Amino acid sequence: ALPISAGQIPIRFRDWDVDALSVSGHKFGTPKGLGALLVRGRTPIEPVLSGGGQERGLRSGTQNVAGAVALAIGLNESNARMQAQYRELVASRDMLIDAVRRVVPRADLTGDPVRRLPGHASFVFPGVTGEALLVDLDARGIAASSGSACAIGRHEIPATLLAMGLEPSVAKSALRMTFRRPLAREQIERVSLALEESYAGLTRR
């Protein structure tokens, strides 16, 4: 199944050449553990849970009605917010990317420069590890990530970057910044200043 950042980009399941698509509610503000799987037509799928035959025999067990309602409400609200703020988020992302490149010219943006999530900026910083940069930025009041959420705390090299062809020595210097609301110019300046000072300090050691 193709995992999608629902509520951040328009979902066009009918137009996409995929058999299945999954969404995780915590990505758009619902309680953790809620999600949905969209399966195209007659795509064969094996159930993980068996028993009572609920949900067309694909997921047996008592249905979480409250969770399903929360997922639907969260997705509706997130989609409405996305439509209202999409352009602002893209502008904030691009301003942040430009600011980071300005203060740390050696930083390389990972992924496609245009076809990316509106509130997402990921870089590699030669000469430092993402973990060291993350810790230093945290001390300066800046929250970021050095890998995917499912690998946090394990100090692993981001598998996505390795799959994109980056060398392990480069991939381990990754830092990811995400946001769900448009950033003010002052916020971007604060992040870029902290990053400039942090990177300079770490590369001098």
Predicted regions and their residues:
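Pyridoxal 5′-phosphate
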Residues: 3-205
